[in-house]
Amino acid sequence: MSKAIGTGVCVWLLATALSAPGGACRAAETRGEGEQKLVRDGVTVALQVQSLAKDGVLREGEFADVRFRITDTTSGQPLAGVAPGAWLDPQAVAADLAQGREHSCKSRVGVFLKSSIGARPLLDLNSYYLMVMNRDASVSVVDPQVSVGGITSTLSRIELKQPPMDWVTPADNKRVFVSMPNADAVAVIDSEQFKLVDSVAAGSNPVRVALQPDERLLWVGNNARAPEQSGVTVIDAQSLKPLKHVATGAGHHEIAFSKDSRQAFVSNRDDGTVSIIDIASLTLSKQLKTGSHPLSIAFSALSQAVYVADGQDGTVTVVDAVSLSVRRVIKLKQGLGPMGFSADGRFGIVLNTLENQASVIDASNDSLIHDVAVSAEPYQVVFTKAYAYIRGLASAKVTMINLASLGEGRTPISQGFEAGPQAPRLAGDLPLASSLAVSRDDNAVFVVNPVDNT
């Protein structure tokens, strides 16, 4: 039975801080139909609630998308530099009558911003959750916006068949695929309900997992001892049916894709090769020699090439994603490991564990432009719009490299912060998954400290 939504929606416009001047707190009514608009101080806020049901009808207990559009009233253009905050809560009739509805709503927003566990709205539209991979056979769900005694609240715990190793999620974050090497399977977690929904057979010793850009297929690296079982298993990401196993070579496998999802590139560490797989037919197209010990592989959308870092040879081999041939070999130093690219594909950062440094490659001309000192034994790197964040195994410090400071003839700007009391190495064996996660606004990262489980 269809039910209209008749609760109040409090909208608070934030400039660069929660206390920014000119903030407007208003209550809006929505009956689940059309678009509601609020116009004030030259700003238009449009609210739309859209059912996710196939028939488009809003029903109690079902999912819906709540969308806000904030525009300049005069020009109709999107308003820059604001961060909307919104809460859904039952209308407080007595408070509205006593204070006036606007002041009543504003006072409640002030309470909600304190993130007290005893004063929460019916629905916090700004909320998000963090999933934390544990070393035992489980995944924890944390609410970072609610704390008890200064410690963030654990919302749920999801039990798995075996300890996890790596994970990946599609853009809509509705599922999480988790590799379990000891179970020869990939766990599928429903991240809307925080429960395990399936375990899919994924070949022998599944470790690395990756979704191709169009998210149609899930690729699983099989670090199997038997040559015929070492390679990748391909799974349909929607039906969860295994489609094919492709033997590629011996050793650990890293996986990258062309931007158009036509080619998959799989490194074979012990064979010193990269296998190129045609995704349409799921057949091996080419096998390239890329050094003695390829440890990482990354794709640049700017140069339309794949970069393969070899730890033993100290080289980065550039493979053209169109011609599928080696375009250049960049000579660096022994000890190379993980590599990644900035979102625009311009700057590639490859970590050197032996030298405690990060080498920066400019993808516009495939050349080395910087060597930057970073945290001891760097082993993980992630990117936001503005920074590269680098985690070291032998240091509690996380290094930040300012991407805007990079370029030929320029001096890189770096800084750091402590992420816990001790270095990650002291925690013992760690999962392959990154301990760094980019925040949803792409302006910060969350850092896990495996030593004290924070």
What does each of the following model-derived ranges do?
Residues 1-4:
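N-terminal secretory signal peptides that target proteins for export/translocation
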Residues 6-9, 384:
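Short helix-onset patch at the extreme N-terminus, typifying the N->h transition
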Residues 25-454:
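Predominantly soluble domains enriched in secretory-pathway, periplasmic, or organellar proteins
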Residues 8-20:
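Bacterial N-terminal signal peptides
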